[in-house]
């Protein structure tokens, strides 16, 4: 919007209005929370929708879900670039909210208009082959999913950075607010996910798919209204142009001066610009020293081409911070694989288990089993933030109790444990099922609880890490690295499912078949556990060598 105003990096310039902190949060978080109600509620039960209503087999449904999930998680990196470079965070969130609303409308129509999906299976067809979906029906379905992905790219890339803009990090209250924000942010998402995984799923499975899709669609509309209502409370930060131009400038300048040598009394390029005033407060670090040469002022740095021959200390240290988080980002991709499997194959397991709630005749919707994980998050996160952190701080004398990467590392251990327990439970379930006995679905509880702990530590930790360890003018991009990692993990998961299915089938029996009772899903889980263990060793090595940066204090 035109009323987005810039914030400078020094005391010489001020924000248009004083940051109001938590007063602005209900409107920003409320918007994204309702957005996740739509996407998470949809993803949790969408496999059932495609199998029952579009007559897809399990492999087709899993492949489509993983592909859509990957696109949805990749979209925020595009939204972040557009936001940080051109449109600003608020405008990007508004655009994303509108696209998401349109996507939900399309999917709602697919459930209400019979011609937009295949006809129901008849009694004779159930034992044979049901009428498949047509290409036109598939295109309508995919268009709705695409709009959802576009909307997600605008909302998720900017909600957290836009929220952090509302805290004044120059005050103790503002710093404490921004630190605790991440836990409460994830807690609100968990509560809404509980609603989507219980109420919405119940409506979809027992009343109507149309009503089940219409509920989050209506909520998305109110989320957009809520975002506009809160405009009087927001602080707007003006984008500074292409955020990657500074990166390329440093690389070009460092290459051109690769033969230069540092000597005593050397000149540094330190212009006192409003957008870069803090650069004269920094010193060059010895990390990635080959980039330091970009700051040297040479005799042939004429005014005409100086822009691409000289860089500030600020620009050089910013690109160093980006390079230094790449190994952590890479390790997170493998770490997400365990979560991917819990979101796909757990539903397949539940469909083959006893879904009856103990002591009642109520049948639990298969996709609702992940509610156990959400309950664990909803209980543990507030307890951790309000009680446990204070005690840990007294012991470690460190703000937050433990470092961000220590938190991520603890979560990775839970991820490995999740896959090991999942393999043990699946082996027992399959053995009983082959003997005509259905295991209670509540045997999936241990792995769901462990996955909840993984999200509490790793997902929350990575969200804070990627937002606080990048330059402030690149926060949207930093925040989107989490979703980029999830996207790449989804693609990797799809590729692994295909490769494992193809390779193991050569031996006569594939680990992953349409009939889970004839599969060896437990072996696949153990394979993911082994990969996660190797990944944890790599992460530990990288984390030990990482140097933290405090951009709030620099600003």
Swiss-Prot record:
Classification via Pfam families: PTR2
Localization, UniProt: Membrane
UniProt similarity note: Belongs to the major facilitator superfamily. Proton-dependent oligopeptide transporter (POT/PTR) (TC 2.A.17) family.
Alphabetical keyword list: Membrane, Transmembrane, Transmembrane helix, Transport
Principal localisation: membrane
Membrane topology, as annotated: Multi-pass membrane protein
CDD domains given in the database record: MFS_NPF1_2 (cd17416)
Keyword match DNA-binding: no
GO cellular component: membrane
Protein name in UniProt: Putative protein NRT1/ PTR FAMILY 2.14
A GO MF label: transmembrane transporter activity
Annotated source species: Arabidopsis thaliana (Mouse-ear cress)
InterPro entries: MFS_trans_sf, POT_fam
UniProt superkingdom: Eukaryota
Annotated SUPFAM superfamilies: MFS general substrate transporter
Disulphide-bridged cysteine pairs: none
Transmembrane portions of the chain: 62-82, 93-113, 135-155, 181-201, 209-229, 234-254, 319-339, 363-383, 405-425, 441-461, 480-500, 523-543
NADP among keywords: no
């Amino acid at each position: 919007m035109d009323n987005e105003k810039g914030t400078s990096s020094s005391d010489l310039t001020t924000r248009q209005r004083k940051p109001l902190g938590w007063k602005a949060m209900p409107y920003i978080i409320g918007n994204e929370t309702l957005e996740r109600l739509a996407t998470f509620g949809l993803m949790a039960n969408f496999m059932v929708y495609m199998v029952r209503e579009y007559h897809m087999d399990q492999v087709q449904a899993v492949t489509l879900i993983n592909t859509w999930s990957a696109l949805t998680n990749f979209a925020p990196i595009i939204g972040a670039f557009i936001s940080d470079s051109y449109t600003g965070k608020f405008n990007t969130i508004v655009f994303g909210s509108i696209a998401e609303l349109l996507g939900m409308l399309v999917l709602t129509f697919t459930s209400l208009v019979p011609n937009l999906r295949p006809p129901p299976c008849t009694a004779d067809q159930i034992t044979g082959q049901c009428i498949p979906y047509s290409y036109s029906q598939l295109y309508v379905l995919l268009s709705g999913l695409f709009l959802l992905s576009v909307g997600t790219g605008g909302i998720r890339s900017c909600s957290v950075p836009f929220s952090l803009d509302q805290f004044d990090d120059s005050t103790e209250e503002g710093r404490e607010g921004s630190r605790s924000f991440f836990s409460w942010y994830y807690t609100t998402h968990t509560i809404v996910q509980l609603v989507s995984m219980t109420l919405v799923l119940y409506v979809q499975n027992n009343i109507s798919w149309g009503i089940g899709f219409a509920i989050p669609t209506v909520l998305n509309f109110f989320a957009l209204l809520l975002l506009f209502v809160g405009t009087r409370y927001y602080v707007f930060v003006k984008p500074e142009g292409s955020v990657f131009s500074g990166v390329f400038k440093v690389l070009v300048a460092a290459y051109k001066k690769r033969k230069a040598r540092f000597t005593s009394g050397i000149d540094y390029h330190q212009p006192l610009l409003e957008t870069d005033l803090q650069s004269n407060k920094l010193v060059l670090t010895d990390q990635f020293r080959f980039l330091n040469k970009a700051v040297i002022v040479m005799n042939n740095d004429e005014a005409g081409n100086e822009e691409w021959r000289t860089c500030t200390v600020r620009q050089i240290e910013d690109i160093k911070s980006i390079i230094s988080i790449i190994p952590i980002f890479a390790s997170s991709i493998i770490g997400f694989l365990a979560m991917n499997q819990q979101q796909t194959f757990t539903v397949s397991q539940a469909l083959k288990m006893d879904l009856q709630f103990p002591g009642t005749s109520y049948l639990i919707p298969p996709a609702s089993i992940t509610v156990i994980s959400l309950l664990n998050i909803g209980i543990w996160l507030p307890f951790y933030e309000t009680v446990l952190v204070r005690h840990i701080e007294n012991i470690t004398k460190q703000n937050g109790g433990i470092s961000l990467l220590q938190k991520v590392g603890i979560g990775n251990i839970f991820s490995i444990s999740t896959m090991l327990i999942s393999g043990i439970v699946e082996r027992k379930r399959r053995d009983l099922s082959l003997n005509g006995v259905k295991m209670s679905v509540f045997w999936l509880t241990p792995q769901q609880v462990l996955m909840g702990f993984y999200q509490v530590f790793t997902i929350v930790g990575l969200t804070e890490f990627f937002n606080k360890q990048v330059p402030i003018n690149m926060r949207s991009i930093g925040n989107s690295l989490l979703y980029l990692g999830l996207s790449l993990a989804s693609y990797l998961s799809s590729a692994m499912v295909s490769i494992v299915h193809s390779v193991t089938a050569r031996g006569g029996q594939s680990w992953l078949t349409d009939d889970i009772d004839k599969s060896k899903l437990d072996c696949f889980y153990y394979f993911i556990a082994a990969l996660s263990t190797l990944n944890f060793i790599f992460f530990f090595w990288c984390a030990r060598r990482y140097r933290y940066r405090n951009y709030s204090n620099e600003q």
